[in-house]
């Protein structure tokens, strides 16, 4: 048994740098060129013409508490009011994208990530989902792959019930009692 922990400072310095997180494919580091407005409009038009099913990602960058393992784009704050201007811009972006798509295109995948999307109040979560339903063809029959990231330190039973009511499937990423 070791009597003391030895920290190798050289090793720590060598590997103390950002690397890809394998939470999605392709990973973020594989995206090298910027997508122009023309490229985006062209892709949306092609999707509309083919009536392709949609996968939507909604980023909510706010967290009340930091998770030290997290490398996501986030804003740590206890000020819940900071979400309001962000949500106003999010609604505008939803409208700007939706107007280029066909209302018959089904949203087969929807993911809310962050940050911690459950940083939003119940009313704010309802508002975002209502806006998405107004502009996109979300599935109502539980056949869609709709997921949301939560902070279990802050999610209570009423929040879990709301998420289920809004169409999110409930699962867990870890069985460890303490992850962060």
Predicted features along the sequence, with ranges:
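Flexible, acidic/Gly-rich N-terminal and inter-domain linker regions that tether
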Residues: 1-54, 103
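Canonical Radical SAM [4Fe-4S] cluster-binding loop centered on the CxxxCxxC motif
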Residues: 53-87, 166, 176
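A cross-domain feature marking catalytic cores of carbohydrate-active enzymes
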Residues: 60, 114, 150-152
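Conserved, mostly hydrophobic/aromatic
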Residues: 63, 90, 112, 148, ...
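Glycine-rich anion/phosphate-binding loops
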Residues: 81-91, 152-158
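Short Fe-S-cluster ligation motifs
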Residues: 92-111
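Radical SAM/AdoMet-radical enzyme domain recognition
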Residues: 104-108, 121-180
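Glycine-rich beta-strand-to-loop/alpha-helix junction loops that act as flexible
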Residues: 111-117
């Amino acid at each position: 048994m070791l009597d003391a922990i030895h920290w190798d400072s050289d090793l720590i310095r060598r590997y103390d740098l950002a690397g890809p997180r394998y939470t999605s494919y392709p990973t973020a580091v594989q995206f090298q060129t910027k997508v122009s407005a023309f490229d985006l409009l062209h892709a949306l038009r092609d999707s509309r013409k083919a009536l392709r099913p949609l996968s939507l990602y909604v980023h909510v960058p706010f967290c009340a508490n930091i998770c030290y393992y997290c490398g996501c784009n986030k804003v740590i704050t206890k000020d819940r009011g900071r979400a309001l201007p962000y949500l106003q811009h999010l609604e505008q972006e939803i409208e700007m994208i939706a107007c280029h798509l066909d209302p018959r295109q089904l949203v087969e995948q929807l993911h809310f990530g962050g940050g911690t999307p459950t940083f939003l109040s119940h009313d704010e979560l309802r508002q975002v989902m209502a806006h998405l339903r107004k502009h996109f063809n979300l599935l109502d029959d539980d056949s869609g792959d709709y997921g949301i990231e939560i902070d279990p330190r802050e999610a209570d039973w009423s929040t879990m019930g709301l998420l289920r009511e809004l169409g999110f499937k409930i699962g867990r990423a870890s069985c460890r009692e303490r992850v962060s």
